[in-house]
């Protein structure tokens, strides 16, 4: 079988270049977390956690869990606190078997494998879509998880009836706490501002209006009454879940792009971007850059048509597009070396963005035997994986009932 060929990513800033840091993930990499210089990477379709060490994808997984990966399910979220690793996935009795539950587990990392599996949170298992999945650790060491509506409609989706059921929320997982935010349709992106400590998220709209939100404590994101900028009629319909406050998104795309991972960068190699937020999407393969305002609670634009914080249909997005060609990219993180790393779910690759001035230094080009072996395996399953990726991308932007 001929391997797929993808266009190489391109950046709009000539001072930076994109490197293919690690390739050969066979089964839909979703998210990653750094543990020192090591990277733990989740593969959605097969429930494996893979280790990248010294720039090389290790052949043996550090964990292999049984998952159901239909729809948007599978191995989805990871974050690390010290030597404790938290994972969020759809568990089944055997790979591809009926889903038991969406669960959060903690593990101990001994530098070679994940051990001492402990159940932290059992979440309702209903539909295969809008599971959320992004996890983050804040500046205090608190662990958060975002979960979508999973096809449910109740008080947490701004209906007047229906018991709270851990859907459409940002949950504080460790230590356990009340709902941090509510009214979220679906999300696959959480980030912590390294300066203010505030959480930000991305949110996937239905037919229109994807969002970027400053998700402060007790934030009501508005679903399913509001997506995108609100109007008086919509605001009047909000039932007012006690203690939670709505505000309009910091930015919206009227034409959906399926925003996913987002991150801040606060490092010397990215000195000129310390006041910016970087955001990925899953439909167009774009990497966006948003300049923060002085208070770091909104954005500033030089283009007048973006001053309303909305990219309307037909309006140019040249000002905010930093890079293209990343495919369905689902995670972006700042590494311990101060560089940006991007997981492309559809390319099976981790990309690295690096200043051009640093490219003469020793940079590892990972085309090792282990990676080549992984590529060989990837070709055997590429047809099935391509179908699942298409479903994953489609359901990020619009509810499609499972067949």
Region annotations inferred by a language model:
Residues 1-8, 359-403:
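Secretory targeting signatures
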Residues 113, 146, 155, 159, ...:
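Intrinsic disorder/low-complexity signature
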Residues 1-6, 87, 151, 181, ...:
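Short intrinsically disordered, low-complexity coil segments enriched in acidic
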Residues 24-27, 182, 324:
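Short, conserved clusters of charged catalytic residues that mark active-site
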């Amino acid at each position: 079988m001929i391997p797929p060929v993808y266009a190489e990513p391109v950046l709009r800033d000539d001072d930076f270049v994109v490197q293919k840091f690690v390739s050969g993930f066979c089964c839909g990499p979703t998210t990653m977390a750094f543990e020192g210089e090591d990277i733990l990477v989740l593969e959605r379709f097969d429930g494996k956690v893979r280790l990248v060490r010294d720039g090389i994808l290790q052949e043996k997984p550090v964990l292999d869990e049984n998952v159901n990966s239909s729809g948007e399910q599978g191995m989805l979220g990871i974050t690390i606190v010290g030597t404790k690793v938290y994972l969020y996935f759809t568990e089944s009795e055997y790979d591809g078997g009926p889903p038991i539950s969406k669960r959060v587990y903690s593990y101990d990392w001994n530098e070679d494998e994940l051990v001492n599996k402990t159940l932290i949170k059992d979440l309702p298992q209903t539909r295969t879509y809008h599971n959320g999945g992004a996890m983050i650790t804040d500046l205090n060491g608190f662990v958060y998880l975002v979960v979508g509506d999973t096809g449910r409609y109740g008080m947490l989706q701004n209906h007047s009836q229906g018991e709270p059921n851990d859907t459409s929320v940002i949950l504080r997982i460790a230590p356990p706490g009340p709902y941090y935010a509510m009214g979220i349709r679906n999300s696959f992106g959480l980030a912590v501002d390294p300066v203010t400590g505030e959480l930000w998220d991305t949110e996937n709209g239905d037919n229109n209006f994807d969002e970027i939100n400053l998700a402060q404590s007790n934030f009501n994101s508005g679903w399913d009454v509001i997506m995108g900028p609100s109007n008086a009629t919509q605001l009047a319909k909000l039932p007012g879940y006690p203690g939670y406050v709505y505000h309009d998104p910091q930015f919206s795309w009227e034409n959906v792009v399926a925003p996913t991972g987002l991150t801040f960068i606060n490092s010397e190699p990215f000195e000129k971007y310390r006041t910016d937020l970087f955001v990925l999407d899953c439909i167009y393969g774009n990497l966006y850059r948003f300049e923060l305002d002085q208070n770091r609670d909104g954005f500033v634009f030089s283009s007048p048509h973006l001053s309303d914080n909305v990219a309307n249909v037909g309006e140019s997005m040249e000002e905010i597009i930093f890079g293209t060609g990343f495919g369905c990219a689902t995670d972006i993180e700042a590494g311990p070396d101060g560089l940006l790393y991007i997981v492309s779910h559809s390319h099976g690759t981790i990309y690295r963005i690096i200043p051009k001035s640093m490219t003469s230094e020793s940079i590892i080009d990972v085309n090792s035997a282990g990676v080549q072996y992984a590529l060989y395996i990837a070709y055997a399953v590429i047809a099935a994986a391509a179908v699942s990726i298409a479903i994953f991308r489609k359901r990020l932007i619009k509810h499609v009932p499972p067949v």
